[in-house]
């Protein structure tokens, strides 16, 4: 946990800034300038909604917002934790906005979204960790845009996990995402406020409560992890029956965040993706610019089709 009065996105003083690595050509993206980008930004401002696209300085924001895709970040824009990789502000959060669920549904309707991703900051200050707000958002979306599929990306609800997962699963999201973020060895420095095996248990709990909810998890590469450690994370996810794995390049948001140890090549990402598919994931996204919600709608459609094909084969064998 960071100091409650510090903001994690505040730059370090000039003299304290270490040299930053130059990004390779495959990691560079165009600056966002399109009409669609500005329309999406304007709508989010009008509805007083936060997006992880902006708060986490996502490199894909130009592409996604041009297509009017956005990941809404609920429960405010201040996190109660201070992970070494994350650009979201940390400190004492504000009161939860009661209009957030309705405004999220309005945004989804105005943007004509077929698939929406909802995430949040950590809210260790709330009795339920913020689970109730996830439920309200899902319910508002079901009322206002019943044909929109819903993907949620939640924190670990430390100390409140079981009740939180049960409440959210009862609300019926289509995809439940919770990121492991990195390999277990790096948790003390990269994700000190969380526990690797607690996050795995959360993913298991989702499947235990409702096996038909797709589960998804992701890790960042380039933080100093070893190849075999990544393979082990894949195995751990499959043991928890995770359907979809995402793997992307870690990018240092500011000089005070964890440094990039390695820029993993596109070829290496392809190799990790092939290994993940061989391990039985229904869906795999593995590339330098892959992020949790990047192409989420298309990926969901492919994952659903893959499960339907798998179930059809199982029925054929059972009848055979």
UniProtKB/Swiss-Prot annotation:
One of its GO terms (cellular component) is cytoplasm. Its EC number is 2.8.1.8. The keyword Metal-binding applies. Residues 14-24 have a biased composition (Basic and acidic residues). Keywords: 4Fe-4S, Cytoplasm, Iron, Iron-sulfur, Metal-binding, S-adenosyl-L-methionine, Transferase. Residues 1-24 are annotated as: Disordered. Residues 1-11 have a biased composition (Polar residues). Pathway: Protein modification; protein lipoylation via endogenous pathway; protein N(6)-(lipoyl)lysine from octanoyl-[acyl-carrier-protein]: step 2/2. InterPro entries: Aldolase_TIM (IPR013785), Elp3/MiaA/NifB-like_rSAM (IPR006638), LIAS_N (IPR031691), Lipoyl_synth (IPR003698), rSAM (IPR007197). One of its GO terms (molecular function) is metal ion binding. This is Lipoyl synthase.
